[in-house]
Protein backbone atom coordinates (compact mmCIF):
# COMPACT_ATOMS: atom_id res chain seq x y z
CA UNK A 1 0.00 0.00 0.00
CA UNK A 2 1.37 3.41 -0.90
CA UNK A 3 2.10 5.99 1.80
CA UNK A 4 -0.54 8.29 0.28
CA UNK A 5 -3.27 5.62 0.52
CA UNK A 6 -2.19 4.70 4.04
CA UNK A 7 -2.39 8.35 5.17
CA UNK A 8 -5.83 8.63 3.56
CA UNK A 9 -7.34 5.69 5.48
CA UNK A 10 -5.61 6.53 8.76
CA UNK A 11 -7.45 8.68 11.28
CA UNK A 12 -4.31 10.07 12.93
CA UNK A 13 -2.05 12.96 11.88
CA UNK A 14 1.12 10.88 11.97
CA UNK A 15 0.27 7.18 11.48
CA UNK A 16 2.86 4.68 12.66
CA UNK A 17 2.81 2.74 9.41
CA UNK A 18 1.14 -0.31 10.95
CA UNK A 19 -2.10 -1.77 9.61
CA UNK A 20 -4.01 -4.75 10.97
CA UNK A 21 -7.18 -6.46 9.86
CA UNK A 22 -9.01 -8.18 12.69
CA UNK A 23 -12.23 -10.12 12.89
CA UNK A 24 -14.86 -8.55 15.13
CA UNK A 25 -15.85 -11.07 17.79
CA UNK A 26 -19.48 -12.15 18.20
CA UNK A 27 -20.81 -12.63 21.71
CA UNK A 28 -24.07 -13.99 23.07
CA UNK A 29 -25.64 -12.98 26.37
CA UNK A 30 -24.43 -16.26 27.88
CA UNK A 31 -20.82 -15.13 27.26
CA UNK A 32 -21.37 -12.20 29.64
CA UNK A 33 -23.13 -14.08 32.44
CA UNK A 34 -21.19 -15.85 35.19
CA UNK A 35 -23.85 -16.76 37.72
CA UNK A 36 -23.57 -14.88 41.01
CA UNK A 37 -20.25 -13.44 39.80
CA UNK A 38 -21.96 -11.56 36.93
CA UNK A 39 -20.90 -7.90 36.95
CA UNK A 40 -22.25 -5.93 33.97
CA UNK A 41 -22.01 -2.40 32.70
CA UNK A 42 -25.14 -1.48 30.73
CA UNK A 43 -25.04 1.63 28.56
CA UNK A 44 -27.83 3.63 26.98
CA UNK A 45 -26.95 6.07 24.20
CA UNK A 46 -23.48 7.05 25.43
CA UNK A 47 -22.22 9.42 22.73
CA UNK A 48 -18.61 10.30 23.48
CA UNK A 49 -16.12 7.74 22.09
CA UNK A 50 -13.58 8.70 24.75
CA UNK A 51 -16.11 8.02 27.51
CA UNK A 52 -17.01 4.64 26.01
CA UNK A 53 -13.37 3.65 25.67
CA UNK A 54 -12.65 4.75 29.23
CA UNK A 55 -15.59 2.68 30.50
CA UNK A 56 -14.38 -0.43 28.64
CA UNK A 57 -10.83 -0.02 30.00
CA UNK A 58 -12.00 0.76 33.53
CA UNK A 59 -14.49 -2.10 33.35
CA UNK A 60 -11.73 -4.57 32.56
CA UNK A 61 -9.73 -3.24 35.51
CA UNK A 62 -12.76 -3.59 37.79
CA UNK A 63 -13.41 -7.16 36.67
CA UNK A 64 -16.71 -6.75 34.84
CA UNK A 65 -17.97 -9.80 33.00
CA UNK A 66 -19.25 -7.76 30.06
CA UNK A 67 -20.75 -4.61 28.62
CA UNK A 68 -24.21 -4.30 27.11
CA UNK A 69 -25.12 -1.28 25.01
CA UNK A 70 -27.97 -0.18 22.82
CA UNK A 71 -27.59 0.60 19.10
CA UNK A 72 -27.61 4.36 19.68
CA UNK A 73 -24.44 4.17 21.78
CA UNK A 74 -21.40 5.46 19.89
CA UNK A 75 -19.68 2.84 17.71
CA UNK A 76 -17.55 0.58 19.87
CA UNK A 77 -15.06 0.38 16.99
CA UNK A 78 -14.75 4.14 16.54
CA UNK A 79 -10.98 4.79 16.32
CA UNK A 80 -11.05 7.13 19.34
CA UNK A 81 -12.95 4.51 21.36
CA UNK A 82 -10.44 1.83 20.42
CA UNK A 83 -7.49 4.03 21.41
CA UNK A 84 -9.17 4.95 24.71
CA UNK A 85 -9.57 1.29 25.66
CA UNK A 86 -5.80 0.71 25.53
CA UNK A 87 -6.48 -2.83 24.28
CA UNK A 88 -9.32 -3.71 26.65
CA UNK A 89 -11.75 -3.75 23.72
CA UNK A 90 -10.20 -7.08 22.69
CA UNK A 91 -10.67 -8.68 26.12
CA UNK A 92 -14.04 -7.48 27.46
CA UNK A 93 -17.09 -9.31 26.07
CA UNK A 94 -19.82 -7.01 24.79
CA UNK A 95 -23.30 -7.17 23.37
CA UNK A 96 -25.02 -4.53 21.24
CA UNK A 97 -28.80 -4.79 21.30
CA UNK A 98 -31.60 -3.36 19.18
CA UNK A 99 -34.05 -3.18 22.08
CA UNK A 100 -32.46 -2.66 25.49
CA UNK A 101 -35.66 -3.07 27.58
CA UNK A 102 -36.13 -6.63 26.27
CA UNK A 103 -32.56 -7.52 27.19
CA UNK A 104 -33.01 -6.02 30.66
CA UNK A 105 -36.06 -8.26 31.10
CA UNK A 106 -33.85 -11.24 30.24
CA UNK A 107 -31.33 -10.13 32.86
CA UNK A 108 -34.09 -9.95 35.48
CA UNK A 109 -35.07 -13.53 34.57
CA UNK A 110 -31.44 -14.50 35.26
CA UNK A 111 -31.74 -12.90 38.74
CA UNK A 112 -29.39 -10.06 37.91
CA UNK A 113 -30.12 -7.00 40.01
CA UNK A 114 -30.00 -3.72 38.07
CA UNK A 115 -28.87 -0.44 39.64
CA UNK A 116 -29.14 3.06 38.22
CA UNK A 117 -27.36 6.17 39.42
CA UNK A 118 -30.33 8.49 39.22
CA UNK A 119 -31.62 11.81 40.53
CA UNK A 120 -34.44 9.84 42.19
CA UNK A 121 -31.89 7.87 44.21
CA UNK A 122 -31.99 8.61 47.92
CA UNK A 123 -29.40 6.11 49.17
CA UNK A 124 -25.66 6.38 48.56
CA UNK A 125 -24.18 3.75 46.26
CA UNK A 126 -21.87 2.27 48.91
CA UNK A 127 -24.87 1.30 51.08
CA UNK A 128 -26.03 -1.29 48.52
CA UNK A 129 -24.93 -4.91 48.39
CA UNK A 130 -23.26 -5.63 45.04
CA UNK A 131 -21.90 -9.07 46.01
CA UNK A 132 -24.51 -10.92 43.93
CA UNK A 133 -25.09 -10.81 40.18
CA UNK A 134 -25.59 -7.17 39.21
CA UNK A 135 -25.55 -4.63 36.43
CA UNK A 136 -25.08 -0.87 36.45
CA UNK A 137 -27.19 1.28 34.11
CA UNK A 138 -25.37 4.33 32.73
CA UNK A 139 -27.12 6.82 30.46
CA UNK A 140 -26.34 9.44 27.89
CA UNK A 141 -23.92 12.17 28.94
CA UNK A 142 -26.39 15.01 28.41
CA UNK A 143 -29.70 13.42 29.35
CA UNK A 144 -28.93 10.46 31.60
CA UNK A 145 -31.13 7.39 31.35
CA UNK A 146 -34.42 7.52 29.50
CA UNK A 147 -37.50 6.98 31.66
CA UNK A 148 -38.08 3.64 29.93
CA UNK A 149 -34.64 2.31 30.89
CA UNK A 150 -34.58 3.92 34.35
CA UNK A 151 -37.84 2.12 35.17
CA UNK A 152 -36.10 -1.21 34.50
CA UNK A 153 -33.75 -0.62 37.44
CA UNK A 154 -34.39 -2.53 40.66
CA UNK A 155 -32.87 0.32 42.68
CA UNK A 156 -31.90 3.93 42.22
CA UNK A 157 -28.73 5.02 43.94
CA UNK A 158 -26.90 8.28 44.30
CA UNK A 159 -23.31 9.37 44.33
CA UNK A 160 -22.44 12.00 46.96
CA UNK A 161 -21.27 15.34 45.56
CA UNK A 162 -20.25 18.66 47.01
CA UNK A 163 -20.74 22.16 45.67
CA UNK A 164 -23.21 22.92 42.92
CA UNK A 165 -22.39 19.88 40.79
CA UNK A 166 -25.53 18.02 39.71
CA UNK A 167 -23.89 15.01 38.12
CA UNK A 168 -20.57 13.43 37.22
CA UNK A 169 -19.14 12.42 33.87
CA UNK A 170 -20.70 9.13 32.73
CA UNK A 171 -17.34 7.32 32.73
CA UNK A 172 -16.54 8.57 36.24
CA UNK A 173 -19.92 7.44 37.58
CA UNK A 174 -19.46 4.04 35.96
CA UNK A 175 -15.96 3.72 37.45
CA UNK A 176 -17.16 4.48 40.98
CA UNK A 177 -19.90 1.85 40.77
CA UNK A 178 -17.79 -0.86 39.13
CA UNK A 179 -14.98 -0.45 41.64
CA UNK A 180 -17.37 -0.41 44.59
CA UNK A 181 -18.64 -3.77 43.34
CA UNK A 182 -15.06 -5.04 43.08
CA UNK A 183 -14.28 -3.75 46.58
CA UNK A 184 -17.34 -5.40 48.13
CA UNK A 185 -16.54 -8.71 46.49
CA UNK A 186 -13.04 -8.62 47.91
CA UNK A 187 -11.57 -9.12 44.46
CA UNK A 188 -7.91 -8.24 44.81
CA UNK A 189 -4.93 -9.51 42.90
CA UNK A 190 -1.22 -8.92 42.62
CA UNK A 191 -1.75 -6.21 39.99
CA UNK A 192 -3.37 -3.81 42.46
CA UNK A 193 -1.87 -0.32 42.40
What are the residue ranges of the model-derived segments?
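RNA substrate-binding interface of SAM-dependent RNA methyltransferases
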Residues: 4, 29-121
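Short, charged, surface-exposed secondary-structure boundary motifs
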Residues: 9-10, 106, 125, 167-171
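Active-site/ligand-binding-proximal alpha/beta "capping" segment
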Residues: 115-164
Amino acid sequence: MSDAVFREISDTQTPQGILAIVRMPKYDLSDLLQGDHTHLLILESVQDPGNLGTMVRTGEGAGITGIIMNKTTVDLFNPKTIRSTMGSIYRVPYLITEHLPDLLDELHKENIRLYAAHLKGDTYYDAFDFTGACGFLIGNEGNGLSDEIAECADCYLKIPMEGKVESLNAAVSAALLMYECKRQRGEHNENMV
